[in-house]
Structures are given as C-alpha cells and as structure tokens.
C-alpha cells in the first residue's frame, strides 16, 4: 500500500495526514502523540476513527499540523484520519459518518464588529 494523504480542518487548525501500513505509530510534527497531546482526552479524540474501525495497530500515521489550539488541532486530526481511512476503504464511510467523524465542523470565531466591545456584546445602554 502506498501513502494515503488527507486534509482535516477545524477552526484555524489545519492537519495534513499521511497514512501508511505499519504498527500503529502516530507522529505529529515529528513528535509522538503522547508528547504532543499530554491530555488523555485529546489523545482519545485523535484515535476515535481508528478505534471505531478497530485498525489502530494497522497503520502508521504522520501528521503536519499548523494553527489553532489543542482542541481544534485534535479535531482537525480526527477529520483528516477519517478521510484517509475512507480513501483506503470506502466501505467504512457509513460507519464513520454515523459517528460524525466525516462532517467538517465549519464553526469559526465570529469577527468583532465596530462600535461594539465584542462580536455580539453591546456597550451598556443608558436610557437617560
């Protein structure tokens, strides 16, 4: 099997995912998954598509990450891994879609508007 690549995005995080047959190693920006994401919850999010299909020990995954925070990055990786697994075996798509791993979460931070302190917050209104 050759290398399969896919792209995952979430908020401002962009994850380029490269999947090849191997023993289950995950490298993020040349660092191990455990050193990049100290939180077990974020590591769980990254591995969700692999665990759902039961293939966590079959593939080596290399990821280039840019932008965003830890949460956005982990969810971008999850989307990228799910897309790569679908490229490898398209029969897995319904199972991954039912778990919500294939859907791109398009929510982003709303921009600040002029004349307001934040995007939707307004300055205190004084009637008199």
UniProtKB/Swiss-Prot annotation:
Molecular-function annotations in GO: RNA binding; structural constituent of ribosome
Region (Disordered): 106-128
The keyword tRNA-binding is annotated on this UniProt entry: no
UniProt entry keywords in alphabetical sequence: Ribonucleoprotein, Ribosomal protein
Pfam families according to UniProt: Ribosomal_S9
Biased composition (Basic residues): 109-128
Domain of life: Bacteria
Record bears the keyword Repeat: no
PROSITE patterns given in the database record: RIBOSOMAL_S9 (PS00360)
NCBIfam families named in the record: PRK00132.1 (NF001099)
HAMAP family named in the record: Ribosomal_uS9_B (MF_00532_B)
Similarity annotation: Belongs to the universal ribosomal protein uS9 family.
Protein name in the entry: Small ribosomal subunit protein uS9
Gene this protein is translated from: rpsI
